[in-house]
Amino acid sequence: MAADTPVEYIKHHLTNLTYGKLPEGYERADGSVVQEATWTFARTGQEATDMGFMAIHVDTLGWSIAMGILFLGLFRFVANRVTEGTPSGLQNLIEMTFEFVQGIVRDVFHGKNPLIAPLALTIFVWILLMNILKLIPIDYIPSIAHALGLEYFKIVPTTDPNATFGMSIGVFLLILFYSFKVKGVSGFSKELAFNPFNHWIMIPFNLLLEILALIIKPISLALRLFGNMYAGEVVFILIALLPLWIQWTLNVPWAIFHILVIPLQAFIFTVLTVVYLSAAHEDH
Amino acid sequence: MNINLTLIGQSIAFAIFVWFCVKYVWPPITAAMEARQKKIADGLSAADRASLDLELAQEKATKELQKAKEEAAALIDQANKRAAQIVEASKEDARKEGEKLIEQARAEIQQERVQARDALRAEVATLAVAGAEKILETSVDAKAHSEMLEKLAAEL
């Protein structure tokens, strides 16, 4: 690993594999100067930061898409062989997941929308699979990546705010879409303007409060998932810094604890998504 | 922890996954699950119906059995009565027959007695004549005394 001190080790493990655009005249870590704006892999964390918005976390995107394909591939595989009779082991597992998600939607969502349940299923299983990657010991995959010449490699997409915000923004757009669709522009505006204090004098205050509450939704969704996963990751990294013989006394309990945290965070994200969308469907 | 294009990439991936799930994953599996639920519900209601039918059938069978028992008892009763009647009639017949036989026998006996008496009567005259001859040591003119003898025989 390209890390000599604990601080470098930690920083290294918290940096994504970034492919982005370096601006013209940028001085790279090794002292060379970029002649013109180029797309390249960042060699240091500083470079990754300096790439600004025009950059992609290849590891985050790659692993999350891989997990999404694993999820959909597996479920589609079962869907092709689905039987009305006695289900086999794999179908049983899939159906349990379905019933779990259907249960959440039935309990929380009071409207009628065929999109909500599959949306919740996608969110739940996808986040679950992405979170599960965390149980792979933190140095395994990055070491392999390093051997292949990739300097940085983070395998858990949910420890990257880009991934969690990507999802929560998707949810946010759905909230806005259904709010406007169900309540209409005037209905939704009225709801923002006349809640919680139903008096014209309070309109500015209401608007401020309601819009804030609206915007807080995707932010809290994304940050809760990211925060939990990121913090867990940091603790794993810190444990990995300890002498080898003592590590198992800490990372085993921590991993066992994450068996709880991983589905819990997926569950919370799913339930809150359904709750927010349910509120978007409620016409007062 | 830089916010960059990954955000948009992730949103697009999310949208595509949701679309795929809505279109190709959710419907077939829920359809199969609902079909199975319906099958199970149908099976349960069929079982309920069957048990109800069984109950009804059992009730009917009990009724039929009861009816059959009653009929059988009535038949036996009737048969017993009939048998008693037959026995009674037979007895009556036998008695009448016996009486008839006895009557017949009596008549025969009477007849024979009359016959015997007549025979005796016939012989008595001869015997009396013979007896008188012996006593008188003479022959008795049968013709002369026949009138007297016949009177005698008639007295017997």
UniProtKB/Swiss-Prot annotation, chain A:
Gene3D superfamilies: ATP synthase, F0 complex, subunit A. It is found in: Cell inner membrane. Its main location: membrane. The keyword Cell membrane applies. One of its GO terms (cellular component) is plasma membrane. SUPFAM superfamilies: F1F0 ATP synthase subunit A. The chain crosses the membrane at residues 55-75, 116-136, 165-185, 196-216, 234-254, 255-275. Keywords: ATP synthesis, Cell inner membrane, Cell membrane, CF(0), Hydrogen ion transport, Ion transport, Membrane, Transmembrane, Transmembrane helix, Transport. The keyword Transmembrane helix applies. One of its GO terms (molecular function) is proton-transporting ATP synthase activity, rotational mechanism. It comes from the Bacteria. It is a multi-pass membrane protein. F-type ATPases have 2 components, CF(1) - the catalytic core - and CF(0) - the membrane proton channel. CF(1) has five subunits: alpha(3), beta(3), gamma(1), delta(1), epsilon(1). CF(0) has three main subunits: a(1), b(2) and c(9-12). The alpha and beta chains form an alternating ring which encloses part of the gamma chain. CF(1) is attached to CF(0) by a central stalk formed by the gamma and epsilon chains, while a peripheral stalk is formed by the delta and b chains. HAMAP family: ATP_synth_a_bact. Key component of the proton channel; it plays a direct role in the translocation of protons across the membrane. This is ATP synthase subunit a. It comes from Marinobacter nauticus (strain ATCC 700491 / DSM 11845 / VT8) (Marinobacter aquaeolei). The lineage of its organism: Bacteria, Pseudomonadati, Pseudomonadota, Gammaproteobacteria, Pseudomonadales.
Curated annotation (Swiss-Prot), chain B:
InterPro entries: ATP_synth_B-like_membr_sf, ATP_synth_b/b'su_bac/chlpt, ATP_synth_F0_bsu_bac, ATP_synthase_B_chain. SUPFAM superfamilies: F1F0 ATP synthase subunit B, membrane domain (SSF81573). The chain crosses the membrane at residues 12-32. Its main location: membrane. It holds the Pfam family ATP-synt_B. The keyword Cell membrane applies. GO terms for molecular function: proton-transporting ATP synthase activity, rotational mechanism; proton-transporting ATPase activity, rotational mechanism. Keywords: ATP synthesis, Cell inner membrane, Cell membrane, CF(0), Hydrogen ion transport, Ion transport, Membrane, Transmembrane, Transmembrane helix, Transport. Belongs to the ATPase B chain family. It comes from the Bacteria. CDD domains: ATP-synt_Fo_b. This is ATP synthase subunit b. F(1)F(0) ATP synthase produces ATP from ADP in the presence of a proton or sodium gradient. F-type ATPases consist of two structural domains, F(1) containing the extramembraneous catalytic core and F(0) containing the membrane proton channel, linked together by a central stalk and a peripheral stalk. During catalysis, ATP synthesis in the catalytic domain of F(1) is coupled via a rotary mechanism of the central stalk subunits to proton translocation. Component of the F(0) channel, it forms part of the peripheral stalk, linking F(1) to F(0). GO terms for cellular component: plasma membrane; proton-transporting ATP synthase complex. The keyword Lyase does not apply. It is found in: Cell inner membrane. It is a single-pass membrane protein. It comes from Marinobacter nauticus (strain ATCC 700491 / DSM 11845 / VT8) (Marinobacter aquaeolei). F-type ATPases have 2 components, F(1) - the catalytic core - and F(0) - the membrane proton channel. F(1) has five subunits: alpha(3), beta(3), gamma(1), delta(1), epsilon(1). F(0) has three main subunits: a(1), b(2) and c(10-14). The alpha and beta chains form an alternating ring which encloses part of the gamma chain. F(1) is attached to F(0) by a central stalk formed by the gamma and epsilon chains, while a peripheral stalk is formed by the delta and b chains.
